[in-house]
Amino acid sequence: MSDRPTPARTRFAPSPTGYLHIGSLRTVLFSWLWARHTGGQFLLRIEDTDRKRFVEGAEEQLTSSLQAIGLMWDEGPIVGGPHAPYKQSERLEIYQAHAQALIDKGVAYRSYATADEIAAINAEREARGEPKLLVFRNLPGIDDAAREAAGADYNVRLSLKTTGQTVVQDLVRGQIVFDNAALKMPDPVLLKTDGFPTYALAAMVDDHLMGITHVLRADEWIPTWPIHHQIYEAFGWEQPVWVHVPQVLGSDGKKLSKRHGDTSVTEYIDLGFVPEAIINYLALIGWSYDDKTEFMTLEELIERFDLNRIRPSGGVFDRDKLLHFNGVYLRNMAPAELAQRVAPYLSKAGLISAEPTAAELAKITEYLPLVQDRLKLLSEAPELLDFFFVDPQGYDPALLVPKKGDPAQTVEILGQVKASFEAVETWDAPSLDKLLHDFVNQLGLKIPQVFMPIRVAISGRTTSPGLFETLAVLGKAVTLARISTAAAALSSASV
């Protein structure tokens, strides 16, 4: 008999106000993993009811970010589903009907006081040393009945409990008890004068109607949790499993911000971080499988993810550690797969075609093992591989001549090496290794006197992949041509 949990329905419900940031992605990942672990469904819902903060194009950025990172949704925009529409601005009648239902139950009311009137009353109360308003009906100087009869605009507010306790259960922190009298929270707006709902109403209604079983969200929602809990109670609905995950912190222990590296997910991908590394690393911020396992495939994360292992304390996002994870993934990636990943960066650098050919991909696959150990970001590939595709431009004589070396002698050595290479029949790394070491020994030279000029001649730099392996993959013709060019450049500079 399987001990697999009951299939869960989780969701990501972003507001289209900007990009999906790396800190937010961690919470999304937890929701996605739990749905996959239980064999359930992960929903995407767009909470676009705050029209003042709405940013054109943000929804497309959010969906493309999830697609780029590989966290596809089972229901929501693009894919549809039985609970469509999945955009809250297209569900206004649903929220309006539920707001009216709460009014009918006597747990919500229409407030006809305008924002200016409330501000004026609060100013007067403050001058008298009284606290600000918590309830917004039957206010002095405002005739609610007359305004209702005149068809005036109104907000719908929830009548928060002011006695007793609101007892909530969180999977991470356990039971939390709120003293309703001590909350001192103003009755929250559920429906605005423009007919649009607030988060408090829309999110709770949608979570219930869409069958969300587990609500995973940041622990910064805990202070306003009594509102959401009381809305569920007012409707008589079963509460979902509430899971308040710890904040993602910066290296200084403060909430993650842009200065810590909390930039958009697409920016990280554009820089050359691979989804596998991002997902693996983020999964470990606030959660762990055990005390020692760090590297896990997506399949392993799905199999091992358990909400009960989420820690209540915040986890630190360390960009350097993410970079380390990324390097490990790149080093362990099959060259053919890695070639596909670096190809767009090589294309952008003008080293290969915009649409890479099979021959170009084969070449990249051949070159990559020589630099793979040094690769930490896909975007570093053009700098590491450029000399395989284009000849070095403008040799620096200071680089061609070894320390304490002689330019004329170096030109002579390059000429002798070229002659030796021309006679080579088997052009591979072992043969070239033997040939060059024999060459050094026979002439009584030191290795740097020979190897350094060759390295600079073929790559244009003093640091490159293994010399013999590089010579082998560049091929005989390219090697001879570059040595000739380098020798000529040095000879001209020495005149």
From Swiss-Prot:
Q: Which residues bind ATP per the record?
A: 258
Query: Could you name the Gene Ontology cellular component terms for this entry?
Result: cytosol
**Which reaction is this enzyme known to catalyze?**
tRNA(Glu) + L-glutamate + ATP = L-glutamyl-tRNA(Glu) + AMP + diphosphate
Recite the UniProt keywords alphabetically.
Aminoacyl-tRNA synthetase, ATP-binding, Cytoplasm, Ligase, Nucleotide-binding, Protein biosynthesis
Top enzyme category: ligase
Where it sits in the cell: the answer is: Cytoplasm
Q: The motif 'HIGH' region: which residues?
A: 14-24
> Can you cite a GO biological process for this protein?
glutamyl-tRNA aminoacylation
Can you provide one Gene Ontology molecular function annotated for this UniProt record?
tRNA binding
Q: Quaternary state and partners of this protein? A: Monomer.
**Its biological function?**
Catalyzes the attachment of glutamate to tRNA(Glu) in a two-step reaction: glutamate is first activated by ATP to form Glu-AMP and then transferred to the acceptor end of tRNA(Glu).
Family to which this protein belongs: Belongs to the class-I aminoacyl-tRNA synthetase family. Glutamate--tRNA ligase type 1 subfamily.
| Matches recorded under PANTHER family | GLUTAMATE--TRNA LIGASE, GLUTAMATE--TRNA LIGASE, MITOCHONDRIAL-RELATED
Could you tell me which NCBIfam families the record lists for this protein? gltX_bact (TIGR00464)
The name this protein carries in UniProt is: Glutamate--tRNA ligase
What is the protein's species of origin? Herpetosiphon aurantiacus (strain ATCC 23779 / DSM 785 / 114-95)
Q: What is the lineage of its organism?
A: Bacteria, Bacillati, Chloroflexota, Chloroflexia, Herpetosiphonales
Tell me what gene encodes this. Answer: gltX
